[in-house]
Every structure is written in C-alpha cells, then in structure tokens.
Amino acid sequence: MSPLVLVDHFIMTGPAVAPHPHAGISTVTLLLEDTQGGLRIRDSLDNEHEARAGDLHWTVAGRGIVHGHELVGAARLNGLRLYVNLPARLKSMPPSATLVRGWEMPVLQSDAGRVRVVSGRYDGWDAPLATPEPLLILDGWLRPGASRLVPLPAGWNAWLYAAQGELGVRARHETTPPPRPPVEAAPVIPAARFRPAGRAATTGRRAADPDFAVLPPGAALTATADRDGFLQLLAAGAPAHFILVAGAAIDEPVIQRGPFVMTDARALTQAVAAYEAGDFGQLRQESGVPG
C-alpha cells in the first residue's frame, strides 16, 4: 500500500541486528508504550540514539545509509517497523536520523479514550517531527463503546491495525459525515453488531455493509480515499488499541531489492553499486562491535 513498502509488528528480545544498508526510503521504528528496555541505533552518520517505550526513530535513507540495532538492558521490545517510500524527487536527498521521545508527542485525551499523534497532524495538533512527505501515524486506545473519526483526504491511503481488542471500521464520505465532533463517546455497541453475516476477508471480517469491517486482534486493513472522507473507528464491549498510518499515494513504479527501493532498474543498480563501493559509509567500531 503506497506509500508504505513494508509494515512489521515485532516482539524483539534479541539478538542485535547487524549493520545493513538502506536507500530510497525512510525506515521508521515505533516502540509501543509497554516496551521494556531500549533499542540502540547507530548509523554511518555517527548518530547514536537509544529509543525507549513510546519513542519514534525515523531514518531518512535517501541516497544511502548504513545502520545497526542493539538491545539495551533486559529488553522486550514491542513495536512497529515501517518502510516508507520516498518519491523519485527525494530518493537522492541526504540521509538523516531523528529520535522523537514519547513525551514530545501530543496526546489527546477524551471520554472516548486517548490517542498519541506520533507523526503528522490530527485534530489541530502537530507531531514534532518534520517528515519528508506528510505521514499521519496515530497510536490510540478506544474505551468500550467509544468511537473516533480520522479524516482521510482524497488521494491518501490508510493502513489500520488492531493491536489489541476488536476494532470496527466504517468509511464515510465527507459529504455525509455524522453530525458529531471528531472525538466522541458513543453508546456501548453490543458485540453482536461486530459479527454480522458477510464475506470473510483475509485480515478482517466484512459486514453486509461494504463500507464496514471488523478487525480481530492482530488483523489489519487498508483503505483508499478517492475523495475526502473519514474513517470511523469503533470499540465494542472491550477496549481497543489501534495503530493508523496514512499518507498520499505515490503514483510511481516501485522496484525493490531488499533494503533498496527505487523507481527503475537503473537506479536500483546504481544504489547497490554505491553501497558496494563504500559510498554509504560505515559504522565506526566501538566496544568491540564491528562496523
């Protein structure tokens, strides 16, 4: 789903991830709030960051970077790893890496629950990180029976993940939004309403309503907006933890070879050759860890 190339929900207790290259994308690691210990990230720009529970680490690989990961302490990392595509005009931009602490992110608290604005802009609040292209990342909880609206502009795609609990999802067009504020506490929704007859989807259950789906824990779906609209997220009789990632689709070819993502074979070959020639740099050796 453009602009995402890869999404991985991981539980990590070891070992270290050896130094490896990236080019043509941003690599993003979001550690969820129940993470224990930390993740140390070193790169060929001589950055050294230590991400902890709730933190976001964003590496713009651009024209090329090498980085490696090491666990810190008695670690049990619960997080998401994203590869976010860069449009062709940004694939040659200089690499960089940024660590955003969880306490720096806006947190919206209401009767419906709470949501962290990890990246992008939501409900008038801006996350602190300026990303190469706008990308919305929300890490939220819904109380039983509550719902939340998330705008989805025309031309954007969204990836929605039920990290915990059962999550209902309804698509609405902007021309007919429900006459309620963006965040609401709704009446408790009986669990039976989340089990309508309908065709089963690969990662969730589809209701008879084609604009409504149910995600069991660990399932995800994607949505595409051909015009401005909303996604309405609903919890039934138990709390629901969701992660939403949304951004504008990149209407360009994608050619991938592992950590290299380009728009054509020639650019891909050039990126691999640049890495093999040492143009991405290398990690400096420290504490006996090879670079």
Predicted features and spans:
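Jelly-roll (double-stranded beta-helix
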Residues: 1-291
